[in-house]
C-alpha cells in the first residue's frame, strides 16, 4: 500500500471535456470511505516490522482479514488458518479477538471525517458515508467562473466517462472527488491509514463504486454511468440494501438478476413483498437511493459474541457468558452510560442461515446502580439473570448443541437519568422504549464490527470470535416491526378530575391514566391493599408527592387529596407492582438473588396461562426462523419480565387481582383500615399516597413523626 501524496492524492487525473449540458439526476454528493484491510493496518501501525511481511489477523480458526502482501501469495479473507498456512508458510498470524484497538482507531477515523462534514454515518469499523453536498456548494460558490474549465477530477472516473464541466452535477462530483482525496490524505498523514473512496450522487452508488479500484484509490461515478454499474452486478444479492432473506424471496419469484428486478411487474412484487419493500428494492435496482446520511451519534447498544464449534453443557455456557459479560462491563465503564436491558442470543447447530433465538429482560435497579463503577460487583446477579434466560431457551436436561452465544446491553441511558433510587418504579416514564431507535437489531453471523449501524445487506462482512454491535438496524427491507408503546402525550389532560396534579398524572402508567380519565372501574373497590406485592423503597417519592400536594393545595384549597380509588390500584404488570400474578403474596426484596424474581414469574405465568403463552409474556423472544428481536417496553427496573397486554386486559386483570386478594387478605385489610384511623399524619402528607408506600417505609416515617412531635390529626379517607 502506497501512501497518498499531496496534490495528486496518489491517484490519476481524468481528462475533462466541455460539451452540452446533460440531465441532472441528483444534487447530492456522497462519499463512501472504505479502509483497506483495516484490522491488518492497525496491527502494522502497532508493529511496523510487520508492514512488508504477509500478515493475517486470526480469530478462532479463521483468517478474518490479511494485508495485500499476503493476498499476493494466495491468502484470502475468511480462509481457514490451516489452508492459509499451506498457501503461505511464511504468513505471520496475529490474534485479533480483542477488538479494543480496532474500535478505538475506528472512532478516530470517524472523528477525523467529521472535521470535513458533520454528516458522517458509520457503517461498521472500517466504513463511513460522508455527505459533502454543502461543502461542495460552498467551494463552487467561491470558485471564480474563469477557473471552472481548469477544474480537475482526482482519481478514476468509472467507465472512463468524459467529464462535462458545463454539467452542474459533473462539477459537483469533481469537487467532491477533490474533497475525498483530501480526506484520504488526512487519514494517512494523521492516522497512518489508507483507504478507498467512492464519489456518487447517493449512498447506494457510492458504496458500489468505491470498490471498483482497490487498494488506496478512489473512483467517481457520473450519473450517465449509473446503469452500467448496476448491471455489472452478477446477482441481486450484491445490491446493498437487499439482504439474504429478501433475495431468497425474490429468487422464488424468478428474480435473479438486476434486469429481472427492473422489469418485474411492480403490482405483483407489491403483492408478494408489500408496497413499501417492493417499491424500495425496485428503486435500488435502478440505482435510486434517497436515504440520507444520518450522523450515527453514540452507540445504542453494546454486544459481545462468541462463535465456537460446540457448546453442549450448562457449565460451558456459563463460562462463555462470564467471558462475554466481563468484556461488556469494561465497555460500559468506559462509555459512562448505563444499560437498562440485557439480551442473550444463542444459535443452535443447524444448516439454516438464520436460526438464532434471543431472550431479554430489564436489569433490576439495584444492579444498574453497580454498573460502571469500575468493579464487577454486578457480575453475579447478571450471570444469574442470563442463565435464567438461557434455561428458558435451552432444555438443559436434554442434549443440545450450540455454536454461538451473544450478550447484549441495550436501552442505554445517560448517567443523570440512570441515577434513580428504588422508588423510580412509581415514577417510570413510559416514553422510553426498550429500543431507543426505530431500526431493528440484527446480529450478523459474520460481523466483527462495533457500529452505530450494521452493514445493511451483508456488505463485506467478517466472521469473528466475537461480534460487537452497537445496536441498530439491518436493511429496512428485512427489518422486523416491533410493538410500540402507547403514547400518553395525546391524553386529554384538561379532562383530569379535580385534585389530580398534572405532573403527577403524567408519570403514572398509561393504563392508570386512561382509567382515571375514562373509567370508574375502581370506584367500587374497597380497602387500600391494592398492590399485590409491595416494593421496598426509599423516601424519595414521598417527598415528591408531598411537594406536589402542597403546590396543588395552594392553587386550589378544595383539592386536598388525590382519591385512592383513582390511583391506588394497579394491575399486576404495571409499574409499582411486582409483576407477580394476582394470587401471589410473595414479597421479594431487591437484595435477594435475581433468580427469585424469574422463578416466581415463571411459575405464576405457567400456572395461569400455560407454557406457550407464558414464554411469550416473560421474555422478549425471537422466532428462530425470523431471527428478529421483539422488545417490550421497560416499564420498571424492579420488574424483570413485563407481560404484554392490552388496556382492556389490564383493567380486567386489575379487577381480578383485587377480587382474588380479597378472600386471602380480608383480615389484613381490616387491620389496615383499623390502624388507619389511629395513624398520625402531618398536615402536608396525603394519607392516600402514604398507604401506597411499602410497609417498612410507613413504619419509618411514623417513627420519625413521633420523634419530631408532629401533630396527630385523624386521617380521613
Swiss-Prot record:
UniProt-listed CDD domains: PolY_Pol_iota (cd01703)
Entry binding sites for Mg(2+): 34-35, 126
Top-level EC class: transferase
Keyword Cytoplasm: no
Ranges for region Disordered: 1-22, 549-589, 603-622, 644-687
MF terms (GO), sorted A to Z: damaged DNA binding; DNA-directed DNA polymerase activity; metal ion binding
Gene Ontology annotations for the cellular component aspect, listed alphabetically: nucleus
Active site: 127
Domain UmuC: from-to ranges: 30-243
Textual note on the cofactor: Binds nucleotide much more tightly and catalyzes nucleotide insertion much more efficiently in the presence of Mg(2+) than in the presence of Mn(2+).
Subcellular location: Nucleus
Biased composition (Low complexity): 575-589
Post-translational modification: Monoubiquitinated. Protein monoubiquitination prevents POLI binding to ubiquitin via the ubiquitin-binding motif 1 and ubiquitin-binding motif 2.
Biased amino acid composition, Polar residues: 607-622, 652-662
A GO biological-process term: translesion synthesis
Superkingdom classification of source: Eukaryota
Binding site for a 2'-deoxyribonucleoside 5'-triphosphate: 39, 71
Quaternary data: Interacts with POLH. Interacts with REV1. Interacts with ubiquitin.
Entry's family note: Belongs to the DNA polymerase type-Y family.
Record's function text: Error-prone DNA polymerase specifically involved in DNA repair. Plays an important role in translesion synthesis, where the normal high-fidelity DNA polymerases cannot proceed and DNA synthesis stalls. Favors Hoogsteen base-pairing in the active site. Inserts the correct base with high-fidelity opposite an adenosine template. Exhibits low fidelity and efficiency opposite a thymidine template, where it will preferentially insert guanosine. May play a role in hypermutation of immunoglobulin genes. Forms a Schiff base with 5'-deoxyribose phosphate at abasic sites, but may not have lyase activity.
Domain comment, as recorded: The catalytic core consists of fingers, palm and thumb subdomains, but the fingers and thumb subdomains are much smaller than in high-fidelity polymerases; residues from five sequence motifs of the Y-family cluster around an active site cleft that can accommodate DNA and nucleotide substrates with relaxed geometric constraints, with consequently higher rates of misincorporation and low processivity. Ubiquitin-binding motif 1 and ubiquitin-binding motif 2 regulate POLI protein monoubiquitination and localization to nuclear foci after UV-induced DNA damage.
Identification of the protein by name: DNA polymerase iota
Organism for this UniProt entry: Mus musculus
Gene label: Poli
